[in-house]
């Protein structure tokens, strides 16, 4: 996201890892809170601009020391609010950082938001690769069919014990 913003693209990112949001930390926004703005008579959440990227995370609305203990429907509703109740403006790219796995958040996103493609990110540990494989298989399912446009291996230098 940051690289595309540096190249002049208009970029946003939704931190969809409801139970473990990391974007406030990664974008040096811990403790920040988005403002509410009025757009065409409707109150909207304004994503926070950092490093040229518009960022919206559940981490902006929760205490980082406390666990987010929500059932699937509540987590899904919070996710969809970050799309539907936010004023993103014109974007070239909107990234969605999903949690590992293939749970309620993934299903809500697939069913509610049109996706142009996914990039699967993993680390070389076997347990992480197993999650990545399941993610690939989910996005390839007949009732899902979201194109996989990339696979990134983070920490490729790391040798698991």
Name every feature range the model reports, one short phrase each.
Residues 4, 9-65:
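Phosphate-binding loop that captures ATP/GTP phosphates
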Residues 15, 23, 56, 79, ...:
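Residue-level signature of catalytic and energy-coupling elements of molecular machines
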Residues 18-21, 40-43, 51, 70-77, ...:
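Charged, alpha-helix-enriched surfaces in structured cytosolic catalytic cores
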Residues 59-109:
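Phosphate-binding/switch loop-helix module in NTP-utilizing enzymes
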Residues 92-93, 99-161:
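Conserved catalytic-core segment of NTP-binding enzymes
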């Amino acid at each position: 996201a940051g690289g595309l913003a540096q190249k002049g693209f208009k970029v946003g990112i939704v931190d969809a890892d409801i139970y473990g949001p990391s974007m406030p930390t990664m974008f040096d926004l811990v403790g920040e809170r988005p403002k509410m703005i009025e757009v065409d008579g409707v109150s909207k959440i304004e994503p926070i601009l950092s490093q040229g990227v518009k960022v919206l995370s559940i981490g902006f609305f929760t205490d980082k020391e406390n666990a987010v203990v929500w059932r699937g429907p509540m987590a899904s509703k919070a996710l969809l609010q970050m799309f539907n109740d936010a004023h993103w403006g014109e974007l070239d790219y909107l990234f969605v950082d999903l949690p590992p796995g293939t749970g309620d958040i993934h299903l809500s996103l697939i069913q509610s938001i049109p996706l142009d493609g996914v990039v699967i990110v993993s680390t070389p540990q076997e347990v992480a690769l197993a999650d990545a494989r399941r993610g690939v298989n989910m996005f390839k399912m007949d009732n899902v069919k979201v194109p996989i446009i990339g696979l990134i291996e983070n920490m490729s230098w790391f040798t698991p014990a």
